[in-house]
Amino acid sequence: MDKKPLDTLISATGLWMSRTGMIHKIKHHEVSRSKIYIEMACGERLVVNNSRSSRTARALRHHKYRKTCRHCRVSDEDINNFLTKTSEEKTTVKVKVVSAPRVRKAMPKSVARAPKPLEATAQVPLSGSKPAPATPVSAPAQAPAPSTGSASATSASAQRMANSAAAPAAPVPTSAPALTKGQLDRLEGLLSPKDEISLDSEKPFRELESELLSRRKKDLKRIYAEERENYLGKLEREITKFFVDRGFLEIKSPILIPAEYVERMGINSDTELSKQVFRIDKNFCLRPMLAPNLYNYLRKLDRALPDPIKIFEIGPCYRKESDGKEHLEEFTMLNFCQMGSGCTRENLEAIITEFLNHLGIDFEIIGDSCMVYGNTLDVMHDDLELSSAVVGPVPLDREWGIDKPWIGAGFGLERLLKVMHGFKNIKRAARSESYYNGISTNL
């Protein structure tokens, strides 16, 4: 049987055992990546490693103790539950009832292949037997002879039919062949949100492609002559000015971070997010988020800067995503946070509202939860998540030496651009050689 870690044991018993073998009743405990923060009923507090092989873990597994804490008032029921060795793992078998589909009865091949008897087939007498008398069949009633007028009308109608058959048929217009999937993908890549061209039209592929190529070349020439700004870079500069003007300090932290930072964020090897980390070697990886470096900045700047501390960072992050319409493996994040006074949900929502109104984006804020921070506030545009926001403190803060209240949120810049410019695919807003400002460069 696998040795259960300490947090599992104390959660099951609700008890703690000291080095002297004294049992305490646990009033409250919190578990981080490697630590357990415990508060006893008697008021004693301690921080211990979440170990499988510590003395306390062994004692709890073996159900042995010497005495109880008189201030914790450990009940007899707690003691009995602790001493009773019951199996912690119970297996249940779920039976799913499935109705069998209706199956037609099988028919022998010889019968299935036999021709069906014709209803009007004449009966052939067998040799040596008398022929059966024929059943008299009544002759069909003879149609009355047409009158002279009707006969001439029939003759004229037949003449017209003969003349029409002799005349050559008018040519039938042929429609353009249906577009293949590859052709549709090519045309969709050339389309822009401003185009009013239907791919269901009867125009041939070459004609549609030629028209779209001409439009995209004109778009690139216009950008080169007038704007000369990349959407992503322009948005970064606009966001930087927004937060600097509101008293936030701009941060530029390393992209290559220790792998230990990821583990301290609660992303262990058995989590799904751990599989998405780009690892350089066993010691370093590309940052999947901005939070670890910002945690370190908050702790260090707290020694020098006045209250409250307000910082933000814009930079690339990397994850092995599905790379679909809403995810990228290389993406640009904005994280802003404030630590100290004024760190309330109302102030956080006020900053988010002012920021998105500045960009002209409609949104709504709803409650949610995530693996790293627990309870979060999700900022949504229709069914697209723009941001996850947090009101601290959270248990994870202790791993980074943070013991003050804080608020913060993270936005993906490519998602903001997707909404601002009406892109159907997030790749049009990303760092790419295939698109510039959402315009295909494969011309």
Swiss-Prot record:
Chain positions covered by the region annotation Disordered: 103-177
Gene3D superfamilies: Bira Bifunctional Protein, Domain 2, Helix hairpin bin
Gene Ontology molecular functions: asparagine-tRNA ligase activity; ATP binding; pyrrolysyl-tRNA synthetase activity; tRNA binding
Catalytic reactions of this protein: tRNA(Pyl) + L-pyrrolysine + ATP = L-pyrrolysyl-tRNA(Pyl) + AMP + diphosphate
A Gene Ontology biological process term: asparaginyl-tRNA aminoacylation
InterPro entries according to UniProt: aa-tRNA-synth_II, aa-tRNA-synth_II/BPL/LPL, Phenylalanyl-tRNA_Synthase, Pyrrolysyl-tRNA_ligase, Pyrrolysyl-tRNA_ligase_C, Pyrrolysyl-tRNA_ligase_N
Biased composition (Low complexity): 131-177
Source organism superkingdom: Archaea
Principal localisation: cytoplasm
Disulphide connectivity of cysteines: none
Protein function: Catalyzes the attachment of pyrrolysine to tRNA(Pyl). Pyrrolysine is a lysine derivative encoded by the termination codon UAG.
Family: Belongs to the class-II aminoacyl-tRNA synthetase family.
Official protein name in the record: Pyrrolysine--tRNA ligase
